[in-house]
């Protein structure tokens, strides 16, 4: 779906207005200018809706740009498939795009990349397939012991295979999407007070504090962030570890194989070492973004009455905004700032150049 079509659907406006707003923004016009002086081009939308429209337009353009970058990178690696192409086309957020790209992203040195460099990927494939029902996992690993490559024992070979599988599990886009939703519903934010810090008393209420991620208020998120920045609070995301591991196991474990236990160990390691820290960072970033956005909205609400207060104490005021094309706008407000009357006067003349008669 084209960006303009999506914006038309999301904001429930006429497609012509959508095209007009996009052009006005691209031409460098500010939101206040568009809201006030180009009303006929967007159906008299207020500045708040127009600002949301502009933000969404920017996000969708960044989303399309990132999709193309990811598509090009995966294609250059010769790993593009119809499944990946479809997933990219259906991705609605930057987070989903990054989840898709994660397995193909050039990584820094990790335990899995070290194991891959040692030639242990075929062993990881065998272990993860879990199709061998007889013998032992050690028997499968013996051919991969190679001192020249740094694989000095069967245990090292199996450990390397598990590292590869753990990273694969961590890179599973569908699994991460599922866990992210569950974390947002069930995870909690917990804090501990660092009592020997100078400003510790300021954050006394967060001494032994916890609250569900789904319920925490924006002002508490910002307060916790300040306390952490001042090193007065230790902050963690809490989630049932056993439950998280079970979800990971369910995505990859097949019972009845001599390698099943290794995949279970890899799933547990992948969750604890890779997935949970990543989810914790994502949850914290999400809460901070939501809290900051809410704080801005609250600031707007508090600022509005200050800006709209009567300009002259105990006086009735006539406001006059002259304009030729759109007419002269007049409004009368009473001593309390209530609008008593408003109108628009259109002055015309036989010739646009005849400014005197106008």
Predicted feature descriptions by range:
Residues 30-44:
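Feature marking long nucleic-acid-engaging regions of large polymerase/nuclease enzymes
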Residues 1-19, 26:
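Generic start-of-chain signal for non-secretory N-termini
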Residues 44, 52, 56-58:
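Short, small/acidic-rich helices and loops at N termini and domain boundaries
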Residues 23-24, 90:
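Short alpha-helical segment immediately N-terminal to, or the first helix within
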Residues 49-51, 63, 68-69, 73, ...:
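Duplex nucleic acid-engaging cores and interfaces of nucleic-acid transaction enzymes
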Residues 21-22, 101:
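Short alpha-helical scaffolding segments that buttress acidic/His motifs in well-ordered protein cores
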């Amino acid at each position: 779906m084209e960006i303009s079509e999506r914006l038309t659907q999301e904001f429930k406006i006429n497609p012509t207005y959508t095209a007009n707003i996009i052009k006005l923004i691209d031409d460098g016009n500010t939101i206040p200018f568009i809201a006030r002086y180009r009303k006929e081009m967007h159906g008299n939308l207020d500045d708040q809706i127009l600002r949301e429209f502009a933000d969404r337009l920017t996000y969708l353009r960044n989303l399309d740009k990132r999709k193309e970058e990811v598509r090009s990178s995966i294609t250059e690696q010769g790993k593009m498939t119809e499944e990946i192409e479809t997933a990219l086309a259906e991705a609605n957020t930057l987070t989903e795009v990054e989840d898709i790209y994660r397995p193909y992203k050039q990584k820094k040195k990790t335990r899995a990349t070290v194991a891959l460099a040692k030639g242990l990927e075929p062993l990881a494939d065998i272990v993860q397939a879990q199709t061998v029902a007889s013998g032992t996992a050690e028997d499968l690993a013996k051919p991969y012991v190679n001192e020249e490559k740094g694989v000095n024992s069967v245990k090292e070979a199996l450990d390397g295979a598990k590292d590869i599988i753990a990273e694969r599990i961590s890179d599973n886009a569908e699994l991460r999407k599922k866990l992210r939703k569950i974390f947002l519903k069930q995870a909690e934010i917990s804090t501990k007070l660092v009592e020997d810090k100078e400003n510790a008393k300021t954050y006394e209420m967060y001494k032994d504090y916890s609250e569900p991620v789904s319920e925490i208020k924006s002002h508490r998120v910002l307060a916790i962030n300040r306390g952490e920045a001042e090193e007065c609070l230790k902050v963690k995301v809490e989630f049932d570890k056993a439950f998280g591991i079970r979800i990971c196991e369910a995505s990859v474990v097949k019972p009845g194989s001599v390698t099943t236990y290794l995949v279970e160990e890899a799933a547990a390691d992948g969750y604890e070492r890779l997935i949970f820290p990543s989810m914790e960072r994502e949850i914290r970033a999400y809460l901070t973004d939501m809290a900051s956005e809410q704080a801005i909205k609250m600031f707007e609400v508090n600022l509005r009455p200050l800006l709209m207060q009567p300009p002259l104490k105990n006086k009735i005021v006539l406001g006059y905004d002259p304009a030729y094309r759109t007419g002269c706008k007049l409004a009368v407000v009473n001593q309390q700032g209530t609008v008593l009357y408003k109108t628009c006067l259109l002055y015309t003349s036989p010739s646009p150049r005849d400014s005197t008669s106008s």
